Swiss-Prot record:
Organism encoding this protein: Sulfurisphaera tokodaii (strain DSM 16993 / JCM 10545 / NBRC 100140 / 7)
InterPro entries xrefs: Ribosomal_eL13 (IPR001380), Ribosomal_eL13_CS (IPR018256)
Domain of life: Archaea
Protein name: Large ribosomal subunit protein eL13
Keywords for the protein's UniProt record, in alphabetical order: Ribonucleoprotein, Ribosomal protein
One cellular-component annotation, GO: ribonucleoprotein complex
Length: 77
């Protein structure tokens, strides 16, 4: 399963030292930049978070790699 990475909110005290965490899903902007439609993502069971507005390059790269792997599998068949 593919998991998105998002930034943590800034805390007043350094309770959590990590800058990133695993998100609930990919944003619509990230899907669009990687070439996925919402229907394709749902068929592949890629999690989507409609509330997120940000787009992180790391997540776009993950989605592009996933799309390339799917195209290679289709060509092999």
């Amino acid at each position: 399963m593919v998991e998105p990475i998002v930034k943590r909110p800034h805390y007043r005290f350094e309770i959590r030292k990590k800058d990133t965490k695993i998100g609930k899903g990919f944003s619509l902007k990230e899907l669009k930049e990687s070439g996925f439609s919402v229907q394709e993502a749902k068929k592949l069971r890629v999690r989507i978070d409609k509330r997120r507005k940000t787009s992180y390059p790391e997540n776009v790269e993950v989605l592009k790699k996933l799309k390339e792997q799917l195209q290679q599998k289709k060509q092999a068949q």
